Amino acid sequence: MALIQVNYLSKVLFRTVPVNVILPSDKISFETLDYQGVPDGGYPTLFLLHGLLGNYTDWVSGTRIQRWAEDAGLAVVMPSGDNAFYIPGLAANSDYGAFVGEELPRVMRTMFPLSRRREDTFIAGLSMGGFGTLRNGMKYAETFSHLAAFSSGIHFFDPNYESLAGEESVFGDLAEAAKTDKSHYVVFEQLKARVAAGEVEAPKFWMSCGTEDSLMPVNLKFRDMLIDAGFDVTWDEEPRGHDWDFWDSQIKKVIDWLPLGEADATLGSGNVSRDL
């Protein structure tokens, strides 16, 4: 399993940005004792978003994503969201939505042997990244076939919500932002219309939240909206809070949920047995 740090000049953000990439390029077959090589069409790819206060290193340091991605033959791309909620910000060169939904897949596919097929391209995230997953996974549904949102911070547009993390510096006035596609509710309505018109295929959703998490009610509310609209939604909950123990468990479940097929057992560091 290769863990690669990339720094590239983002046209959208107009600066150099860091990205971590997990690439299962060094898997050695037990049968041939040689590298397996790139699958036909390239590696299926998960774009994985961190939460507030985090960066592109969070998922590697907080979970066992490397082990599970290697086992599944899955490439994982982890950008930095810079507390920007993965939306078009107020400042110039701050459209983090277009960065995640358009530019990042295109650039990563030019650098690495990643599949360009929608059915092999997925997006997931936690907390702020869960919001970014829902908003951008729906907005760019022509790119992403499966969305997985953990403990999603989708409470910004609740009139009873008190801003605690400087959200208005990114969204602007929340009442006004709620009327635009910065809101996942607006993008949800747009997606329903696009699917009904046959313009895009509906993505599949995984949503989850810890039962001890204060974000549970708003996540249940949005889950029910998706189900009522006829979307394919898998829901999961565990007796946990807003923490890495929950997200570590969830990312393994989601990798198992994704349409990846059966991966062959391979030889690797610390993994020398066929009995996997």
Please give the residue ranges for each predicted region.
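Non-catalytic cap/lid and distal C-terminal segments of serine-dependent acyl enzymes
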Residues: 1-276
